[in-house]
């Protein structure tokens, strides 16, 4: 999709398919392999968006991108639906096909995103915030069940 649109794409990570993917990557795609955390932060800082094409139960990398003020273009299944907000923190593509991704990339080009809203949204998933929300929920349910009023 990025090759067809002439967009640069940097891919981070390795795995069993690395050599195969590197061989089929076109002129605008660069596979970087495994990189350290400092380099990942530099990549987030220098990118226009983070592309999240996989389906995972909960992906932390889209939140890392948002915390860096970068929107996410994600496959609209799995954990991305919990972390990406259409039009606010990114956009989705519906199928894992070149055409669907091209549509999302073109749509993305017409969108604008507020870096501060992206960061605020990512902070909602911070460990301490999450723990505090869980604790408050448990306390509320305990109090309801035991007739305790605040």
What are these regions (language model features)?
Residues 45-57, 70:
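Acidic donor-binding loop of glycosyltransferase active sites
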Residues 110-147:
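A charged, aromatic-enriched C-terminal amphipathic alpha-helix characteristic of glycosyltransferases
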Residues 41, 63-67, 81-82:
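Short alpha-helical segment that forms part of, or immediately flanks, the ligand-binding pocket
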Residues 19-38:
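Nucleotide-activated donor-binding/catalytic signature segment of Leloir-type glycosyltransferases, i.e.
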Residues 67, 71-75, 84:
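Short hydrophobic beta-strand element within catalytic cores of glycosyltransferases
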Residues 42-47, 134:
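Short alpha-helical donor nucleotide-sugar binding micro-motif in glycosyltransferases
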Residues 1-9, 14-19:
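Short hydrophobic signal-anchor/transmembrane segments that target glycosyltransferases
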């Amino acid at each position: 999709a990025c090759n067809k649109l002439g967009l640069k794409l940097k891919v981070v990570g390795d795995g069993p398919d690395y050599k195969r993917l590197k061989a089929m990557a076109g002129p605008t795609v660069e596979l970087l392999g495994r990189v350290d955390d400092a380099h990942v932060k530099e990549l987030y800082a220098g990118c226009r968006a983070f592309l999240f094409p996989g389906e995972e139960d909960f992906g932390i990398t889209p939140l890392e991108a948002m915390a860096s003020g970068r929107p996410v273009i994600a496959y609209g299944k799995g954990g991305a639906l919990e972390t990406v907000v259409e039009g606010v923190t990114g956009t989705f593509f519906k199928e894992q096909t070149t055409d669907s991704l091209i549509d999302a990339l073109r749509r993305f080009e017409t969108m604008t995103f507020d870096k501060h809203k992206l960061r605020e949204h990512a902070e909602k998933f911070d460990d301490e915030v999450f723990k505090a929300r869980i604790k408050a929920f448990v306390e509320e349910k305990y109090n309801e069940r035991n007739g305790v009023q605040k």
